[in-house]
Amino acid sequence: NEIKSFLPVQSIIKKFLIIFLVFIFIPNKLSSMSHIVDDKGIIVLMYHRFEENKYPSTNIKIADFVKQIDLIKKYNFNFINAKDFKSNLVNLKSNKKILLTIDDAFKSFYEQAWPLLKNEKIPFILFVNTREIGSNGYMTWEQIREISKEKFVHIGNHSYSHDYLVDKQDDEIIKDIDLARRDLKKNLGYNSSFFSYPFGEYSINFKNIIKNF
């Protein structure tokens, strides 16, 4: 299985960098990246679960993930970290840059993909919806702290509840995001300037709340 499509991102919104992307990984030929090697922008790849076959819409087999990483290397793309992503949005110097993001902090990421990323020091952002941390199927705070100690890793805000926040009132949205922010500060010692919308869904109002948070 190879990577079929990528979506470039070049938008920056004040205090929070908003990542609300949906990426599709579909079987294709190895040459499937050749049509984007000259594209301008930063490619962001989003993953969720690894080797959790009962969740096909958000799952990827670890063997396919390894193939995708190898494919990225084959075409000489550069993996960038959160800091470089932010600076490159302000001053786009070149193409062929890729940022990996992982949503939800599922336990399967820690068990399946983390060893590979750690061994190869591939940078990524792990977006955490903090209410679920430590519950069944999710990572623990201890595991997240372990990961966050690596310089190539950044832990981002993915809300507290992972609810459909676009349906909530302003005060509910603010409370939810603030709870996640407080959890991150308490457990990791910092507040992230990166936010990933739950389900990739947002509204103008929601975006403005994040913008001014």
PLM regions and their residue ranges:
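N-terminal pre-catalytic segment of deacetylase/amide-hydrolase enzymes
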Residues: 26-98
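Bacterial N-terminal signal peptides
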Residues: 18-24
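Noncatalytic alpha-helical scaffolds and linker/capping helices
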Residues: 103-105
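Positively charged n-region of N-terminal signal peptides that target proteins for export
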Residues: 11-15
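Metal-dependent polysaccharide deacetylase catalytic core of the NodB/CE4 family, i.e.
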Residues: 40-55, 95-98, 107-205
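Short, intrinsically disordered, charge-balanced linker/junction segments flanking boundaries
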Residues: 207-213
